[in-house]
Amino acid sequence: MPPIVKKGGITMTIIEAINRLDKIKPNGYGQEDKIEWLSEIDGMVKQTVTDTHEGGEDISFTGYDATTPLDTVLLIPIPYDSAYLDWLAAKIDFADGEYARYNNSMTRFNDTFLSFSRFYNRKYMPKGSKIKYF
């Protein structure tokens, strides 16, 4: 799967996201749960961001599960990759019933995800209907 940022860009892997989250937010959730949650966010990236732009078909994504290699590169590049940590933190907060923390985590996630979406819109041409000239 080619990353969104071409050669020379810096990206995060599944295991890096999990390790960084566990370091800043110790929790009792297993690696499989976190991989599933990472699959959710990259599924959103694929469906709502990359597939709506030219070249989106070059980015393949079929989801992550326990059999996915942990060195798989995630889709959102630096400096927007903190979205992964905020998303995972929000999922944990919600599962733990910590709704005020969940709201804070989701606010941070939404801000970063929106910034990433805007970056992608500037970098890649959105798909659209072709204009017919008479």
Where are these regions (language model features)?
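Charged, low-complexity interaction regions
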Residues: 26-30, 95-100
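Generic detector of ordered secondary-structure context
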Residues: 33, 80-81, 101
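Generic alpha-helical propensity signal that fires on short helical segments
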Residues: 98, 106-110, 127
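Conserved short "hinge" loops at termini or chain/domain junctions
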Residues: 1-73, 111-134
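Short, hydrophobic/amphipathic alpha-helical patches that form generic packing surfaces
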Residues: 82-94
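Short, charged, amphipathic alpha-helical segments
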Residues: 35-36, 103-107
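Structural motif
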Residues: 73-82
